[in-house]
Amino acid sequence: MKYLKFKSQYNKYPSTKVENHIAVCGYDEIANVLNEHLKEKNVIAFEYYPGVNNEEIKNNLISKLNVDCVINVEELTLPIQEIDQMLKRNLTDDRVFGVMSHFVIEDFYDMDKILKLNESIDTSKKTLIYGFGASLIKHDSLVYFDMARWEIQLRYRKGMPNWLCNNYDEDRLKKYKRGFFVEWRTADRLKKNVLRNCDYYIDTNKENEPKMISKTALFDGLRKVSTHPFRLVPYFDPGVWGGQWMKEVCNLDPNEKNFAWSFDGVPEENSIYLNFDGVNVEVPSINVVFFEPINLLGHKVHARFGTEFPIRFDFLDTIGGGNLSLQVHPLTEYIQDKFGMHYTQDESYYILDALDDAVVYLGIKTGVKKEELIEELLLAQKGEKIFDDEKFINKFPAKKHDHFLIPAGTIHCSGSNAMVLEISATPYIFTFKLWDWGRLGLDGLPRPVHINHGQHVIQYDRDTKWVENNLINRFVAMEDGSTKTGLHEREFIETRRYFFTDKIKMQTMGSVNMNNLVEGKAAVIESINGEFEPFVIHYAETFIIPEYIKEYYIRPLNENEKCGVIKAYVR
């Protein structure tokens, strides 16, 4: 093995067992259950998360139901031209960035038509209403069809259009933008209002392999997750700078050219698996945040962030790859004013592994003038010259277990041959690329560069000396034997690292904990009061400790083995 001294046991399919419930698999079995249900109900609504395959549901499920009347609620929407006009301010002309929207599902419908349908619907007949917005029609039973955002993104890449659109071949970044800034926000508002009222919940993430559970099963599962240690289902993606480390450590396909990103700590986009008697039902992990925020986040974090999960862990693999783009993130007031976000993308790079020549670019060199830097970046963007990073940007050697702190406004990127655990605030698409080393994306298009935004947020006082004194390995030994590794005082996340060869006690510090096993083959999380079963984690796995747990033990799985965990929580 090239990068590990032991065989990796990284688990790509973590799940949480939910007792006393079953999952119904396949359209035929689901149809049988719903037909029995329809004997006692007359009007049933199929509410969809945008991205659910309408044709698949119609052909394989609706066609098998004993109903007298079928209504596609989406035929009552406003004309798409009118909707596009409504969204103009939110979608902007930019390829990547939009403005966060506050639409509700009613905004996209002709409410006069909805009212007329509600007045005319014959509740004595067996009637089915389906589509995104079906719950607007009065009903006596509701089935919710859900899908994770990563699956939606994969379907965009395969040609799926946005809701109501015919943009099959449109740039996938623009599809994602419409989803991120408009569709998913609207759908989440609707989900929060209707999911507790559903009778059944259907996982549609795998094509033609639906799985259905009862509402009680779903919410029992969400509650269990919110009171036990758990992991998210990771996903991996290639990139122009991607590396080779994750192939070995995360047990990925060795025939792929590279993997650049791994997301196993982004509840807004990841899933969880709820396991019902051996059947994994995939549920967007954001559902835990929406419906169990106090258990998961804790009162302090919920009061500050609402039903948002504020911490994000992901991997950036450049070992055997290339540099990330030189970039900067917006200051808080900039992301609020320009994009309507609540808080900004402060972050850090924890070096999980590194080759001897690994570096991190961080901050500007002492004496750099704003006008000269921006002029050089603009000339490089036009292709008139190569940007001279040696002249303008600091470059620091990076070794295993270093921690580089990156408050918003600091120019940065990882160089090649580093394996980065990125620990950051959750807003995750607001990266202003300044220079991308002259590369094209995997889609063959120039990668978006946003000097027009970046020039307004670069902090020029973060020069060589300031970075050295404030952002690199600012380690502080703590009384409990841990090491405080960050983050910077401008960032709301605190990180503590623990090395141990025996059982130690850890506290949640009044906040949800997001952790990663950064050293050792495996460790075990144990309950202090017996409330949960021992939970095994393996090297490089990210795991979440809900604030509900308060305190917990962690020990090496193998006796006397040295293990290391980094813990992130909201200060």
Model-derived regions: residue spans:
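Double-stranded beta-helix
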Residues: Y361-D388, I423-R462, N558-R571
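ATP-dependent NMP and nucleoside kinases share a basic, alpha-helical "lid"
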Residues: K64, L115-C165
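Short acidic-glycine-tyrosine-enriched beta hairpin
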Residues: F392-L405, E526-I549, Y553
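Transition-metal
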Residues: I22-C25, E29-V33, R196-E371, D436-F475, ...
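Glycine-rich P-loop/Walker A and Walker A-like loops and their local beta1-loop-alpha1 context
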Residues: E19-S63
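Small-molecule kinase domains that catalyze NTP-dependent phosphoryl transfer to phosphate-bearing small molecules
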Residues: K2-K7, A134-S135, K158-F219
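Ligand-binding loop in jelly-roll beta-barrel domains
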Residues: E308, T318-N323, L331, A354-D357, ...
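ATP-dependent small-molecule kinase phosphotransfer cores
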Residues: Y3-V24, E29, V67-K126
